[in-house]
Swiss-Prot record:
It is a peripheral membrane protein. WD repeats lie at residues 176-216, 221-260. May be involved in cytoplasm to vacuole transport and autophagy. This is Autophagy-related protein 18. Its main location: membrane. Disulfide bonds: none annotated. Gene3D superfamilies: YVTN repeat-like/Quinoprotein amine dehydrogenase (2.130.10.10). InterPro entries: PROPPIN (IPR048720), WD40/YVTN_repeat-like_dom_sf (IPR015943), WD40_repeat_dom_sf (IPR036322), WD40_rpt (IPR001680). Belongs to the WD repeat PROPPIN family. GO terms for biological process: autophagy; autophagy of mitochondrion; glycophagy; nucleophagy; pexophagy; protein localization to phagophore assembly site; protein transport. One of its GO terms (molecular function) is phosphatidylinositol binding. GO terms for cellular component: cytosol; phagophore assembly site membrane; vacuolar membrane. It comes from Dictyostelium discoideum.
Amino acid sequence: MNVGGKFNEGILFLNFNQDFSCIAVGTPEGYKIFNSDPYTLYYSQSNGGAGLVEMLFSTSLVSIVGSGDGNTSQRRLLINNIKNNIPICDLNFVTAILSVKMNRKRIVVIMETKIHIYDINNMKLLETREIASNPKGLCALSPSNTNYIVYPASQNNGNILVMDVLTLETVNLIQAHKSQISALALSQDGTLLATASDKGTVIRVFALPYANKSLSFRRGSIPAIIHSMTFSLDGRYLCVSSDTGTIHIFKIDFSSSNSSSFHQAQPSSSPSGGMMGLNFGGLTSKMSSYLPEVISQVWEPSRDFAHIKIPPGIPSICALMQNNKTAMVLTADSLYMQYNFDESVGGELKLAKEFSLLMEPDLDNDVTAKIL
């Protein structure tokens, strides 16, 4: 999550790694890597502002994009081995890098109108794909070997393209919402896609790759800006944060009353030559039998199973630890908080620990850590 120092001048970027075991923080001076539990500083580098910092699970491979201040560039991607402090790759682009996603097979670099896909083993460029204008760099890459990447198909509607980054083929076109997409997330195994529109009132979850099952969740009735969405590692929960100050945790259950099942013909392989070569009409016609029903469901979407209250207006990211007993929250004003999560109870979660992301972790320092 790129926050650009708007809420704390010392925080430019915040994110978890793929399994939520580490926290990456970009600062005006460089970047830091923390272990999430126990909260400890793993690595720190001060070579200039970092606007994007992405890890590959808990490995030593880290991708960094500059903040654009001083001698750092938003058009330059550095991939470093932080264990040996050795640069692996240095790539320069014509336009600003908006997002970088990695799994064990691919590195995907997202610009406003292009996606570049690289083989992570040798950094060979496999494809450059033209996309519709995507000024926020919205996309999600599955961490697992399903290797799906999803991104908005248009700024004018809520359509989402699903692409296989191994075969470089478009797998599906999903009409998730009526208005444009504001947030996306994929589950660890790549079988679930969560979507939100710019209205931010309804969250949808689709079963991939064919979207033949879906769930709808009610975040609230008042429009909101969705800051982040993350699935739990086992895919049983979805955490959603917004500018309202309430972080919602929804339970994923396709046997519930808010679940829909549809029969859809599986689309055949489509051209890999970019979006301009994709037969949108063919994909849309194959899905026309069920898409209106997805969007205009007659039942009320489900409410959250649990929630967290934080100050409104501050961007945040929420994720569940592997055991689903702790919810972790990162905020743009430099806080890292841990909440007790009871799967048998739900409701409002209680704050257990609070840390400052700008201070050296020290459990004996009352300013750095508050254990409540």
